[in-house]
From Swiss-Prot:
Residues 215-282 are annotated as: Disordered. Disulfide bonds: none annotated. PROSITE patterns: RIBOSOMAL_L2. This is Large ribosomal subunit protein uL2. InterPro entries: NA-bd_OB-fold, Rib_uL2_dom2, Ribosomal_uL2, Ribosomal_uL2_bac/org-type, Ribosomal_uL2_C, Ribosomal_uL2_CS, Ribosomal_uL2_dom3, Ribosomal_uL2_RNA-bd_dom. GO terms for molecular function: rRNA binding; structural constituent of ribosome; transferase activity. Residues 263-282 have a biased composition (Basic residues). Part of the 50S ribosomal subunit. Forms a bridge to the 30S subunit in the 70S ribosome. Coiled coil: none annotated. Keywords: Ribonucleoprotein, Ribosomal protein, RNA-binding, rRNA-binding. SUPFAM superfamilies: Nucleic acid-binding proteins, Translation proteins SH3-like domain. It holds the Pfam family Ribosomal_L2_C. The gene is rplB.
Amino acid sequence: MALKYYKPTTNGRRHMSSLDFGANLTTNKPEKSLLTILKKHSGRNSQGKITVRHQGGRHKRKYRLIDFKRNKDDIPGIVKTIEYDPNRSANIALISYIDGEKRYILAPKNLKVGQKISSGPKSDILVGNALPLAKIPEGTFVHNIELKPGAGAKLIRSAGTWAQIQGRDEDGKYVILKLKSGEYRRILATCRATIGVVGNEENSLVNIGKAGRNRHKGIRPTVRGSVMNPNDHPHGGGEGKQPIGRKSPLTPWGKKALGVKTRNPKKPSTKLIIRSRKETKK
């Protein structure tokens, strides 16, 4: 999908860019049977307390039900449309199966309307097809990857992301993947993945341009701690501009903000990570 640039008719339009939706999308009307209501929570939990900051005030939108499990085995389908999804960075494709059922999937790069797709161990190694990792050859780029067999995809779902199959364990239980971040990790060979790279890779190059576009997406301003009151942030308070007054920068909750590992070392999946993304960059 190409980028569209704007003339500097206003300060907000200067340097602004957006995705040219007319280049790849085939319809602007979603499938009604696959829509559901998406409630606004504005970052609050069931008690009304803010659990996620900087959220609220977005535009109304419907949620598209996406097939992350890809468990419709040995039933071929045809790509009917490629559509915009306001709930994610990637585009989605509407698949019509020969038994009459319709499902949305993430649209990989180079997926075309009218193309046939399938899922299951016997599927061909073609863009859009979903197979167990054990059936996919080394060097293949995949996305929409499960962490537990049958639980639905959790990894590699954002626009432009990918993972590449590097090899297998000696017993064949695990498949070794290289992620776009540089991380190498093992995943059970019985987990499913979809062939190809997630489309809409230019999404990361979009220049928002003005604050209003983020407000439409439900992103509220991020305020510096140093301009808050002392009861709101450890950096707050003082007359005029003041230094932090602490040995190191702190989070709003009083924990060290720089150089502290946040991943739980006792997390069970740590043993499956062969090389972290930070080690790869060294």
